[in-house]
Every structure is written in C-alpha cells, then in structure tokens.
C-alpha cells in the first residue's frame, strides 16, 4: 500500500489506483492529502496528471523519498530481456512491478548499423521521461559515440558504428517481423491505441536470420500516391544466440511513428544459434494517432560512418487493464526432425529507392498492419485501402505473395479495391477471418515453412489478438466480449441509425474475388466470437424490450396519478369558491333578530304541546280532550268538588275537616293542573308547579 500518512483513505487510494494505473502511487497519495480524500476532486486532478504520465511527461525522479527511489515510469519498460546475461540488472528489478523488463541490447550483439545520416531522420518529437540506463549507454543498451550522445530529457537511441572493418565481421541474423502502420488511418472510438506483441519466435536452426520487429512508415508524396519507405542497410539489429528477441518500439503523438526496416547485409552466417526454449515476452507497442499531415521522412546515406539520432515517445505501456489494443502473439516454431530448415542463401541490401527491388526470405514471419501492402505499385494500387496482416513477407515477389497465408483487414467491404480511398476509419469491431493457407512448393533443396496466423479476440475491450505460430493450423479461439463492446453489423439497426465507422473484414490481399464474398460466408468465418456476440446482443435486446414494457406500465401509472391529482385539485378549488360565496351571504342584524324571535315562539309552542301530552297520560285513556271546548277556562274554578255520599260518618267528618281547613286557611288551586293544594305548600303536589307563577 502507499507509504503515506494515517490520513489517507486506503479504499479511495485503491479505487484511484484502479482507475489511474499509469499514475505513480506517490502522486496519488499526495493528491489525496491535498484534497482531503475527496474522490471527485482527486479524479479531476489525476485525469490531468494521467495524460502527462501516459506520454512520459510526468516527473518520476522522486529523490526525496528513499522508499520509492526505484519507482520509474512503467510506460518506458519493455519486456525484451529474456536472459540473465544483461547489461542492466537494476532496471529489470525496478520495472518488475509491472510484469515487464527493461528494453536492453547486449553489447556482444554489436551496434546498430548507421546507414542514414543524422539530418535525414525523423522529425523532432516532444520530450519524454528519461530512461534510467547506465552512463555511456543509450536506451537500447548500446554505447553511444562521443560525437553524438543523447541528452537526458530525451528517450532516444544513438546509432553508432564501428567502421567498415567491423561491418564485414558481423553476421546478419535476421528474421524480421514488420509492423507497418498507415499515417492516414483516422482515429475513432474503436481505433486501437496500442500494439501488444507477446514475443517473437527464436531463430530457426541453420537460419542466418534473427528475429526483430520493425515499424515502417508510409510516405505520402505530394502527388497523392502512397509508397512504403525505401529499405536501406541502416538500422540493422544484431542478435546473439542468448538474446534472440529484440523489438524496436518507437511511437509519436503526431504521425505514425515508424522505424525503417532494412535488409541484412550481404553476409552469410557460419554460426548456428543455440536452440532456445519457448520464451514469452510482453511488449506493448503504442499506436499514435495521425494528428499531423507530414509523416516522418527517411532518406539514405552512402556513408556507413554516419551516426543517427532519434527521439521517441514511448507511451501507454501498461500492464493494467488494456483497452483499444492490437495484440500480436508470435509463437516459436515446433521443430520437426524429418524436415530440415535451410536458409535460401545470402541476401544483398537494397540501395535503390524502389520497394520493388526488395526481396525478403520466404521463411521470415512478417506481420503487416497497413493501409496498403508493401508490394509492387500495381499491387499497392489495387489493394490500397486495405489494412492487412500477413504471416509471411515477400514484398517484391507477387508470385510468392499468393502462396502466403495472409490475413487482410479491409476497411471498406463490398466495393472494388480500385475504387476505395484511404479515408475509411479502422473500427475494431468483430473481424471476419478469411485465411488462405500457402501452396507448398519446393525451390531447389529448400522447403519453405510458412507460419500460421491465428486471430483471436480476448476478453479485453476492443482488442484484436493475433497469434503467429509456424507449425500450428490456423484457428480462431472464442473470446469474451465486453458488454460495452460496440457492434455495427450483427443486428439490424433501426431506420434512423447511421453507421459512423466501417467494419474491418479480413480478406486475402492477392485475390480479386475476395471483395465479392457474400455476407453469409463472412458471417460463417466469425466463428464463436460472432455467435457469442450475437447471442449476447439478442439477450440484451430482449432485456431492453422488457425494460421498455415496464417503462410503459410506469408511464401509465404516472398518467393515472396525474389525472387523480388534477381532479382533487379541482374539487379543492370548487370548495374554496363555495366557501367564499357563503361568506358573502351572511344575514344582517335585523334578520338575525327575527330568526331569534321565531325560535323563541317555536320553543313555547313545543312546551305547551308537551304539557298537553303529559295531562292526557295522567287522566287516563277515557279522557277526551275534544269534548272540552275550552280547557283552560275551568282552571280558575274555586271550591272543592263534593265527594259522593258514602255513609254517615263520612258526612260527619267532612265538615270537621273543612273546619280545620278554614282554620289553616283556604286551599290554593294550581294554575297548571287545577289541583287543590294545602295552603302551606308553595309548589303543586301533583305537577310541582310554583304557587305564584
């Protein structure tokens, strides 16, 4: 983890390291401390710092921290050193963190041949991160001459020479693998941005050629014709048997950075390289986008003592998640005891300015990625808009070109090669593979062994993986396609869909009828990758339809809720209006007094009716109120009602009681029920009515 303070959030640090693998950890830690572990702020700052470290402009000399003194820009470390007999052992350990090794070159291999003048090389490139190499050696591990030494801020190499006497003693051990990039391939969303080469096969027994990888430029002349850079005897890399793998890896942010390939000198090898086992190296070759209209020009020089100097910007060399890459894997040949591989004799270096005079050995595995094959002018004009990959190289021999197992990536499908232009964009979509095995024929006592090209598509995003194996049959292995992998030709698009980039098709460069291959045959060549991708797209399409149905249901619910809300708002508005109208209709004070008097009168009537009902219930069922015309007239009758005469004693007692009543006072009659009460009572004995009401 980071050697930062205790204030660093390690979860945020892990997320930032995953998102920006090219930025050193100390820079991420410092950014987190400055922004108080704010993820958004750190992402905004690191997105700007990421560009600097991608293109080698970041400051990697952390002299203040001894714990990270070995930390260097992992973009500048290339895995080419396979043996322990290396010049630079500290660089190998310093760059082991990214799974690669330092780009070195053995002293015993000899220096590169300086066949070109210093003033006629590539154009000036921006400064890059300094490569940490020993003093006196350049980035390729070769001793620099005292006349033209590299400056520290530039990542370049110096092409020195030892003289003509050393040239005659050196042995050309070459089996070049050439990667040609067209400068007018437009960049797009699916354009590959780096080239991943796992390794090159070790030298074949009794073969005077070694193995190397060149990048050739395409020079666009003012007349509009495209030609390949002329091959000369300069920039020849030598290999000893113990370090057979060497890759030149230049790249520019402007035009397509290329390194001129050259034929070996006219010498035969009396040495036999030691047989090497299966060795794998990982080299990421960045592919820069053509932003400038002037590609680098390369000229020849007759002097073998002339030195050359070039600066290279090695960028985007990462072992993290790789996207937008072209991955090429070269496997060593499986030796057969019954077959004896021989070289086809010495070859002379081409000093003319024509590509037609160049002839390469037939058993050299060559990989081309270009807008037009490096063949004759007729062949170039016929297949100019094609981006093709060839497993064998015979750039000057059209007859041998037919017998090569080649793979073409065509930028425009369905049209004739003569009518195509160079404006087609390279889209790393699903490639349809069309492989033609070579026609085996013997030339004298030599038997040509052609490597096989296996094109696969791994699970990295927008990756085109090419495996070159000399003795294996061609096959296409299925790869896991990322869910964000964009396809343009497997499913039917809607009518309003506009295709922005063309699909690459792998066809044969030498056969004219390949352009008229039916779409069914192309789809059959897609193998499991296309089938898996199509199944994935069908699954995604079904999922999209299901989500659309759910969206429609949710939209209907939303409309229903909106209608209910509108109705409730209307009801509320009506109630408010009604309330305001009722407030305006308040009665006046006179009307309220009249209503109060009416209510009082009604209450009196109710009380009278209630009392009549009570009186009816007290008189019994024989009481007939209708027979009494004036009921209230009899209320004021004074005098007792004489009882019925029963016997004598009742007659005698009656006057006595009356006397006593006279003594106490007269009885008072109730005004409500006409009951005669005792004079001492203040309320009626029957109805509880007050005496003086």
Swiss-Prot record:
Matching Gene3D superfamilies: DNA helicase RuvA subunit, C-terminal domain, Zn-finger domain of Sec23/24
InterPro entries: CUE, TAB2/3_CUE, Znf_RanBP2, Znf_RanBP2_sf
UniProt zinc finger (RanBP2-type) residues: 663-693
Low complexity bias spans: 220-231, 286-310, 343-359
Residues recorded as bearing Phosphoserine in the entry: 372, 450, 482, 524, 582
Subcellular location: Membrane; Endosome membrane; Lysosome membrane; Cytoplasm, Cytosol
Tissues/organs with expression: Widely expressed. In the embryo, expressed in the ventricular trabeculae, endothelial cells of the conotruncal cushions of the outflow tract and in the endothelial cells lining the developing aortic valves.
Function noted in UniProt: Adapter required to activate the JNK and NF-kappa-B signaling pathways through the specific recognition of 'Lys-63'-linked polyubiquitin chains by its RanBP2-type zinc finger (NZF). Acts as an adapter linking MAP3K7/TAK1 and TRAF6 to 'Lys-63'-linked polyubiquitin chains.
Official protein name in the record: TGF-beta-activated kinase 1 and MAP3K7-binding protein 2
Organism annotation: Homo sapiens
Lineage: Eukaryota, Metazoa, Chordata, Craniata, Vertebrata
Originating gene: TAB2
């Amino acid at each position: 983890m980071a050697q930062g303070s205790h204030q660093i959030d390690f979860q945020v640090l892990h997320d930032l390291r995953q998102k920006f693998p090219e930025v050193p950890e100390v820079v991420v830690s410092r950014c987190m401390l400055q922004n108080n572990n704010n993820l958004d702020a750190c992402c905004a700052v690191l997105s700007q710092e990421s560009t600097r470290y991608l293109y080698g402009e970041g400051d990697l000399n952390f002299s203040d921290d001894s714990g990270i003194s070995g930390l260097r820009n992992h973009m500048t470390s290339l895995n080419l050193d396979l043996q322990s007999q290396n010049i630079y052992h500290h660089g190998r350990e310093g760059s082991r963190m990214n799974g690669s090794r330092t780009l070195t070159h053995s002293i015993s291999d000899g220096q590169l041949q300086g066949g070109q003048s210093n003033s006629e090389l590539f154009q000036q490139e921006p400064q890059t991160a300094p490569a940490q190499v020993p003093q006196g050696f350049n980035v390729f591990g070769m001793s620099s001459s005292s006349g033209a030494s590299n400056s520290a801020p530039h990542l370049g190499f110096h092409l020195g020479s030892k003289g003509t006497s050393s040239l005659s003693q050196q042995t050309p051990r070459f089996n070049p693998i050439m990667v040609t990039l067209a400068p007018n391939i437009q960049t797009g969303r699916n354009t590959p941005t780096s080239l991943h080469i796992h390794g090159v096969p070790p030298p074949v027994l009794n073969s005077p050629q070694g193995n190397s990888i060149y990048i050739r430029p395409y020079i666009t002349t003012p007349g509009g014709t495209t030609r390949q850079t002329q091959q000369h005897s300069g920039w020849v890399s030598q290999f000893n048997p113990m370090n057979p793998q060497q890759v030149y890896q230049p790249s520019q942010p402007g035009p397509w950075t290329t390194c001129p390939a050259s034929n070996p000198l006219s010498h035969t090898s009396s040495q036999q390289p030691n047989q090497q086992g299966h060795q794998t190296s990982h080299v990421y070759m960045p592919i820069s986008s053509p932003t400038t209209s002037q590609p680098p020009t390369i000229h020849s020089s007759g002097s073998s003592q002339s030195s050359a100097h070039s600066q290279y910007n090695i960028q985007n060399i990462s072992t993290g998640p790789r996207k937008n890459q072209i991955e090429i894997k070269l496997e060593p040949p499986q030796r057969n005891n019954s077959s004896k591989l021989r070289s086809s004799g010495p070859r002379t270096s081409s000093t003319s300015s024509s590509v037609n005079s160049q002839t390469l050995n037939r058993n050299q595995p060559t990989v081309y990625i270009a807008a037009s094959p490096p063949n004759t002018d007729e062949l170039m004009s016929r297949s100019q808009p094609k981006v093709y990959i060839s497993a064998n190289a015979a750039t000057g021999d059209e007859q041998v070109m037919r017998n090569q197992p080649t793979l073409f990536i065509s930028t425009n499908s369905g049209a004739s090669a003569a009518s195509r232009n160079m404006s087609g964009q390279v889209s790393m979509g699903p490639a349809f593979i069309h492989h033609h095995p070579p026609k085996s024929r013997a030339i004298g006592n030599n038997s040509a062994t052609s490597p096989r090209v296996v094109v696969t598509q791994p699970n990295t995003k927008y990756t085109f993986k090419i495996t070159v194996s000399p003795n294996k049959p061609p096959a296409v292995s299925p790869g896991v396609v990322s869910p964000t992998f964009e396809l343009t030709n497997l499913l039917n698009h809607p009518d309003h869909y506009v295709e922005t980039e063309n699909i690459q098709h792998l066809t044969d460069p030498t056969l004219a009828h390949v352009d008229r291959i039916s779409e069914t045959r192309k789809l059959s060549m897609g193998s499991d990758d296309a089938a898996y991708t199509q199944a994935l797209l069908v699954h995604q399409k079904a999922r999209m339809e299901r989500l659309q149905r759910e969206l429609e249901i949710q939209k209907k619910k939303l409309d229903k809720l909106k209608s209910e809300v509108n109705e409730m708002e209307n009801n509320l508005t009506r109630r408010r209006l009604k309330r305001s109208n009722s407030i305006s209709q308040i009665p006046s004070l006179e009307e309220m007094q009249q209503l109060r008097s009416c209510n009082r009168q009604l209450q009196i009537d109710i009380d009278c009716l209630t009392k009549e009902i009570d009186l009816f219930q007290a008189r019994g069922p024989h009481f007939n109120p209708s027979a009494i015309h004036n009921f209230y007239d009899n209320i004021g009758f004074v005098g007792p009602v004489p009882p019925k005469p029963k016997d004598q004693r009742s007659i005698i007692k009656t006057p006595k009681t009356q006397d006593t009543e006279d003594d106490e006072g007269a009885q008072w009659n109730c005004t409500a029920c006409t009951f005669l009460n005792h004079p001492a009572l203040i309320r009626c004995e029957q109805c509880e009515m007050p005496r003086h009401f």
